[in-house]
UniProtKB/Swiss-Prot annotation:
Other comments on record: 'Ropporin' comes from the Japanese word 'oppo' which means 'tail'.
Family: Belongs to the ropporin family.
Residue ranges annotated for the RIIa domain, each copy included: 12-49
Name of the protein in question: Ropporin-1A
Organism domain of life: Eukaryota
Stretch list, region Interaction with RHPN1: 209-212
Organism whose genome encodes this protein: Homo sapiens
Length: 212
């Protein structure tokens, strides 16, 4: 009697494992993504720490620019206020400023972007390659988006901050939706003034605001 095919059993920890892999790939920006992925999962299978290094420990590619808030600000100015941008156009912008293609692909994969990209979501994930933590990521996003040239703390509309914080926390997967909601409600009621603006200092210098 022929054997029946056994159903594929997906371990419950797989989604979290893949999410951690994707975040690590954005931070490391490996030159050879396939080889790095093989080394990453081989280390996991042996119970060892995967080859995840912080940016300060990596050597920049000799012919590639390092991702910086300044370069992201240039890209943001080129997007010119659009909420949606086509992937092909954004990829060309990315290429013009000489940023690594692997990093672009990693952000595309983590965000599950297709032909049309929500620019603020893409920008938030690109900033996470620099920020590592959610608070630092949001600080960088605010610096990129801020149009305040008076030398004060970078500032953006609180509605934009709400959108970014909620999205980044969802992608990160380590912070509950209830915590995000609680922090946003506190800031809206106790921190944000009638102008509806939030500054970087509002969420980095206030001990009652714990985004993570």
């Amino acid at each position: 009697m022929a054997q029946t095919d056994k159903p594929t059993c997906i371990p419950p920890e797989l989604p979290k494992m893949l999410k951690e892999f994707a975040k690590a790939a954005i931070r490391v920006q490996p030159q050879d993504l396939i080889q790095w992925a093989a080394d990453y999962f081989e280390a996991l299978s042996r119970g060892e720490t995967p080859p995840v290094r912080e940016r300060s420990e990596r050597v920049a590619l000799c012919n590639r620019a390092e991702l910086t808030p300044e370069l992201l600000k240039i890209l943001h100015s080129q997007v010119a206020g659009r909420l949606i941008i086509r992937a092909e156009e954004l990829a060309q912008m990315w290429k013009v400023v000489n940023l690594p293609t692997d990093l672009f692909n990693s952000v595309m994969n983590v965000g599950r972007f297709t032909e049309e990209i929500e620019w603020l979501k893409f920008l938030a994930l690109a900033c996470s390659a620099l920020g590592v933590t959610i608070t630092k990521t949001l600080k960088i996003v605010c610096e990129v988006l801020s149009c305040d040239h008076n030398g004060g703390s970078p500032r953006i509309p609180f509605s934009t901050f709400q959108f970014l914080y909620t999205y980044i926390a969802k992608v990160d997967g380590e912070i509950s939706a209830s915590h995000v909601s609680r922090m946003l409600n506190y800031m809206e009621q106790e921190v944000i003034g009638p102008d509806g603006i939030i500054t970087v200092n509002d969420f980095t210098q206030n001990p009652r605001v714990q985004l993570e």
